[in-house]
């Protein structure tokens, strides 16, 4: 959480968190209380609660607005954000995904059912095409489980697994 200090502060400012209904009700006034807790339960995907999860929800919503809204000021609730600011907001989502889905032992277990299915599809005798649709978290765990090397995404505010990203496998015979 300490590495997200600037991102948290920016999100708090853009959301005007201190004047929000959530703060006025005593629910949350800042993301920097460092109360993030991982929840690991047998048979369930990893989960968390606390600051990082709350900030991730805000980050995710802002990123969707960034991509969907033609007016950048409107997407940022009237704030004039730079590309660097948007990258700081997106960093929260990247870290959240890393914490929950890309640690090697977690990634292998979370991605295992999907990897087994993908293997079966790739080995299906008469299969010409398979389309699977998932989430950025699916891609993050599959990439980590397959030990995909680090990559960079130039001109993208998200540095790890962008919303709407695709992972393509092609079988040559």
Predicted regions: what they are:
Residues 1-130, 134-173:
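Signature for phosphate-centric chemistry
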């Amino acid at each position: 959480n300490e590495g997200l200090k600037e991102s948290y502060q920016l999100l708090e400012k853009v959301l005007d968190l201190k004047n929000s209904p959530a703060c006025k009700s005593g629910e949350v006034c800042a993301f920097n209380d460092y109360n993030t807790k991982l929840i690991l339960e047998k048979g369930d995907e990893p989960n968390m609660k606390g600051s990082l999860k709350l900030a991730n929800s805000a980050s995710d919503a802002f990123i969707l607005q960034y991509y969907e809204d033609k007016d950048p000021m409107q997407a940022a609730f009237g704030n004039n954000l730079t590309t660097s600011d948007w990258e700081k907001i997106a960093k929260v989502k990247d870290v959240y995904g890393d914490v929950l889905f890309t640690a090697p032992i977690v990634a292998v277990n979370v991605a295992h059912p999907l990897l087994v299915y993908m293997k079966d599809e790739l080995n299906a005798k008469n299969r010409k095409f398979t389309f699977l649709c998932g989430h950025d978290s699916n891609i993050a765990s599959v990439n980590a489980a397959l030990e995909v090397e680090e990559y960079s995404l130039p001109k993208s505010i998200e540095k790890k697994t962008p919303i709407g990203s695709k992972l393509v496998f092609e079988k040559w015979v």
